[in-house]
Amino acid sequence: MALIVHKYGGTSMGSTERIRNVAKRVAKWARAGHQMVVVPSAMSGETNRLLGLAKELAPAKQGDAYGRELDMLAATGEQASSALLAIALQAEGMESVSYAGWQVPIRTNSAYTKARIESIDDARVRKDLAQGQVV
C-alpha cells in the first residue's frame, strides 16, 4: 500500500461532472489499497472571478490588510472544491474528509498573496489516512 498524492487543476475540477470523474479516478486508487491525498484547485475561472469582485470594490488598494483579505478570498475557491470532491467521493462509497489550511495546520510566512509554506503539521492527515479516509 502506497501513499499517493494527486493534484487536480481548475479544468479537472471545472464542473460537477468533472469532479465526479476525479472522484471515480481517486476511488479506483483507494480501492486498490492505496492511501490517497488529493489537492484540488478551485473550479476553472473561480479564483479570477473572486479576485475580480475584490478589484471592483477596491481596484488600487495596497498593503498587508488588503493582501490578507485577497488570500482569504482566493482560498474559498479551493475550500469549495475540496468539499465538493469529498462529497463526490462519499457518493462513490469512499470515506473522505476535506480540510481548510488552518485545520491541518499549514503555516506560511506573512508575505500576503505570495506566501511560502514554512511548516505543515501532518498529524491529523496521517490519522485520517490510517482510518481509511481519502483526504
Predicted regions and their residues:
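Nucleotide/pyrophosphate-binding catalytic subdomain
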Residues: M1-V135
